[in-house]
């Protein structure tokens, strides 16, 4: 049970980190363009 939960968490962690990285990248790009 615990292993399944950990596996699910690790599978969710990657897309969440990619999404956060993409959002941060967009914010930095907008900041650079408009500054």
UniProtKB/Swiss-Prot annotation:
CDD domains from the UniProt entry: DWORF
Membrane topology per record: Single-pass membrane protein
Protein function: Enhances the activity of ATP2A1/SERCA1 ATPase in sarcoplasmic reticulum by displacing ATP2A1/SERCA1 inhibitors, thereby acting as a key regulator of skeletal muscle activity. Also enhances the activity of the ATP2A2/SERCA2 ATPase. Does not directly stimulate SERCA pump activity. Binds preferentially to the phosphorylated E1 and E2 conformational forms of ATP2A2 which predominate at high Ca(2+) concentrations during the systolic phase of the cardiac cycle. Competes with ATP2A2 inhibitor phospholamban (PLN) for binding to ATP2A2 and displaces PLN.
Cellular localization per UniProt: Sarcoplasmic reticulum membrane
Protein name, as recorded: Sarcoplasmic/endoplasmic reticulum calcium ATPase regulator DWORF
Gene Ontology terms, MF aspect: enzyme activator activity
One GO location term (cellular component): sarcoplasmic reticulum membrane
Domains (record comment): The transmembrane domain is sufficient to compete with phospholamban (PLN) for binding to ATP2A2.
Pfam families named among the record's database cross-references: DWORF
InterPro entries: DWORF
Keyword entries, A-Z: Membrane, Sarcoplasmic reticulum, Transmembrane, Transmembrane helix
Keyword Nucleus: no
Chain segments annotated as coiled-coil in the UniProt record: none
GO biological process: positive regulation of calcium ion import; positive regulation of calcium ion import into sarcoplasmic reticulum; positive regulation of cardiac muscle cell contraction; regulation of ATPase-coupled calcium transmembrane transporter activity; regulation of slow-twitch skeletal muscle fiber contraction
Domain of life: Eukaryota
Transmembrane portions of the chain: 14-34
Self-association state and partner proteins as the record states: Homooligomer. Can also form heterooligomers with other sarcoplasmic/endoplasmic reticulum calcium ATPase (SERCA) regulators ARLN, ERLN, PLN and SLN. Monomer. Interacts with ATP2A1/SERCA1; the interaction results in activation of ATP2A1. Interacts as a monomer with ATP2A2/SERCA2; the interaction results in activation of ATP2A2.
């Amino acid at each position: 049970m615990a292993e399944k939960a950990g596996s699910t968490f690790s599978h969710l962690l990657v897309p969440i980190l990619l999404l956060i990285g993409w959002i941060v990248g967009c914010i930095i790009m907008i900041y650079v363009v408009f500054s």
